[in-house]
Amino acid sequence: MLLLELKKTNQTLETIHFLGIGGVGMSGIAEILHNLGYKVQGSDLVENYNTKRLESYGIKIFLGHAKQHITNVSYVVISSAINSNNPEIKEALERKIPIIRRAEMLAELMRLKCSVAVSGSHGKTTTTSLMACLFEAAGLCPTVINGGIINNKSTNAYLGSSNYLIAEADESDATFIHIPSTIAIITNIDPEHLDYYKDFETLIGAFKSFITNLPFYGFAVCCIDHTIVRKLVDDITERKIVTYGIDSEDAHIIAFNINTDIASSTFDVKINIPNVLGTTIIEKITIPTPGRHNILNSLAAIAVGIELDFGIKAIKNGFNNFKGVKRRFTKVAEYNNAVVIDDYAHHPEEIKATLATARNIADKQNGKVIAIFQPHRYSRMQHLFDDFMRCFNDADMIYITDIYAAGEEPIEGVTGQNLVDKITKNKHHDQANFLAELEDVVGVIIDNAASGDMIIIMGAGNISSFANELDERLSSRT
């Protein structure tokens, strides 16, 4: 029996326990189930923004993991980040409590909706958020499950009143190919999560299945500026695919006349989708977030809006209402007329896109770009070491901390210091420095910040918490 049907009967699911409930993906699903009337609880190692938010809704949160936490639960939901040695998993196995993967629970929520699944190596969260704003502007309030905090809502998930559900589809362990989506988005495909997939071709194959698993009446939206995505699109003939890009003249949706500053991007769009609009120009679309990569993200949302006949007014209004996403080029401080930005970038391609945006802004202000980066996961650094060496070219100064483990064991020779040494040795940059402590970031800013500078703090680890305290820390040092 389907999960949502079960709720409509007199049967109950008793308690659903989320292991790692503070994660962005897990917290979103937990919140939706809570809003649907299910009894939800969860555990995580540390308190964070998500656990505090869920607790404020009346959801019981355990800090730390212990077998006692699942004494009276019927189901345990886990993500791929949870180790099989976790005491709560061991207890669930011992007591034969069903263990459900996050993707399976997400799929169940999506099954009875017209679902939009947003996938890709980068840009998923912003694309999902932009699309949600367009749906609302079109009068369709969707249910949304996102991988980041949507500033408009101060949450990463909310229950809507329409028959649409928009979800970020996590490709990290291939479970996304089983999501029952009607509309599938692929923003890009880069070598990522190779600790799971083992090789790039297997990862590409998973994205192909993601599209071919669509129902015959569904469609995919793909960015063909990305070489791998273009090849994938060329290989698929059995599903409808709408393409978009900036550099691809043969794309169905193309952005041009682009202007960007520290707070926004403005552009025109040419639309040429057979049997939909013919050739149409939409002038002066503005999104309140900078960067070429975010223009591409907005084109994916526009493609869906055009296919669903939202209308040009709804598309423009939706973007005007967008307030951004937490940790996506977020201003956290100013010092000596320099701006400090916090960003989630943790993959070489994300770092390049973020620094390119900063470079564009800094050049207009006669400033420099100072990049401060905390690497995330030893396995990612090992697989993409050469790419990490080459991704900081748009920065004038680079500061790299030690690697945030995210539960992984250290790998010999894979360190932040080693990355700095190799960047210098191979002459990729002559201003690369190692930071032994996060606290040293304060001194870097005080010693180097000047008017017009863009100071970009990047990483998927705990550097964000530190970045959000910088305004106070810098004030106390002046």
UniProtKB/Swiss-Prot annotation:
Coiled coil feature spans: none
* Catalyzed reactions: UDP-N-acetyl-alpha-D-muramate + L-alanine + ATP = UDP-N-acetyl-alpha-D-muramoyl-L-alanine + ADP + phosphate + H(+)
Per the record, the GO terms for biological process are: cell division; cell wall organization; peptidoglycan biosynthetic process; regulation of cell shape
Q: Where in the cell is it found?
A: Cytoplasm
Asked whether the keyword Ligase is assigned, the reply is yes
What EC number(s) does this enzyme carry? Answer: 6.3.2.8
A single GO CC term, please?
A: cytoplasm
User: Which residue ranges run through the membrane?
Assistant: none
Q: Which InterPro entries match?
A: Mur-like_cat_sf, Mur_ligase_C, Mur_ligase_C_dom_sf, Mur_ligase_cen, Mur_ligase_N, MurCDEF_pg_biosynth, UDP-N-AcMur_Ala_ligase_MurC
**Keyword terms:** ATP-binding, Cell cycle, Cell division, Cell shape, Cell wall biogenesis/degradation, Cytoplasm, Ligase, Nucleotide-binding, Peptidoglycan synthesis
Pathway assignment reads:
Cell wall biogenesis; peptidoglycan biosynthesis
Residues binding ATP are: G120, S121, H122, G123, K124, T125, T126
Broad class of the protein's primary localization: cytoplasm
What does this protein's UniProt record list under function? Answer: Cell wall formation.
Q: Write the protein's name.
A: UDP-N-acetylmuramate--L-alanine ligase
- Source organism per UniProt: Rickettsia akari (strain Hartford)
